[in-house]
Regions:
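Oxyanion-binding/catalytic loops of NTP- or PPi-dependent enzymes
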Residues: 7-207
Length: 207
């Protein structure tokens, strides 16, 4: 994968990519970071540094270039993991204060919630009470992901579903989406509050 990413980057900038900085999740320890660095070297890359994704985010937004000092929070909800990190930033330096999260909480959980809702609505509409086969499951996941994205800008989204020779048009609203994923969002907020509280105990206030 790293070799492919480096190759794609080389094509984009029309220059060979050899020296790299690789990002990793905030919860990665020494063993995981070493394994990541080794993977980069196996891919033929010169790994200059392994840095955490929150640090990379702070660098990207230019926090370290600003004058003065500040404490910032990076909320990182990925496809399969969630991390929240508090960092103290000063000119030329980024220091991690604390980190929290859930390695099994991510966008996939939101997709699963939408899938379950759509499947339930489909069964109610058609009377189907069996299991979705592999093809129907894959189709359902793709449509759930698309519906989730569309609900960012729309109040409701219609979804055409097919399974076991049956077809039905079901609908999901933004309000319903918020309701079925509320527990997931609250979990991330609780982790965020815990990180903020721990940072405060250590003398740092987010501004």
């Amino acid at each position: 994968i790293l070799r492919k990413l480096a190759g794609d980057a080389s094509k984009l900038i029309v220059a060979a990519v050899k020296d790299v900085v690789i990002t990793c999740p905030a919860y990665f320890g020494t063993a995981e970071r070493t394994a990541t660095k080794n993977a980069g070297e196996i891919a033929g890359l010169n790994v200059i540094e392994i840095i955490s994704e929150p640090t990379a985010a702070a660098l990207y937004y230019g926090c370290a270039k600003e004058q003065g000092e500040k404490t910032v929070l990076v909320y990182d909800l990925g496809g399969g993991t969630f991390d929240v990190t508090v960092m103290h930033v000063s000119p030329g330096k980024i220091e991690m204060v604390c980190s929290d999260g859930n390695h099994e909480l991510g966008g996939k959980n939101w997709d699963d919630a939408v899938m379950q809702y759509l499947a339930s609505e489909f069964c109610s509409e058609t009377g189907f009470d069996g299991d979705f086969d592999e093809y129907a499951q894959q189709d359902l996941r793709l449509k759930a992901e698309k519906a989730k994205q569309q609900l960012s800008t729309r109040e409701k989204v219609p979804v055409m579903m097919d399974a076991a020779g049956l077809r039905a048009r079901v609908e999901i609203t933004r309000q319903t989406f918020d309701e079925i994923t509320e527990a997931l969002l609250n979990e991330s907020i609780e982790k965020t509050d815990a990180a903020i509280a721990l940072a405060a105990e250590r003398g740092y206030t987010i501004v």
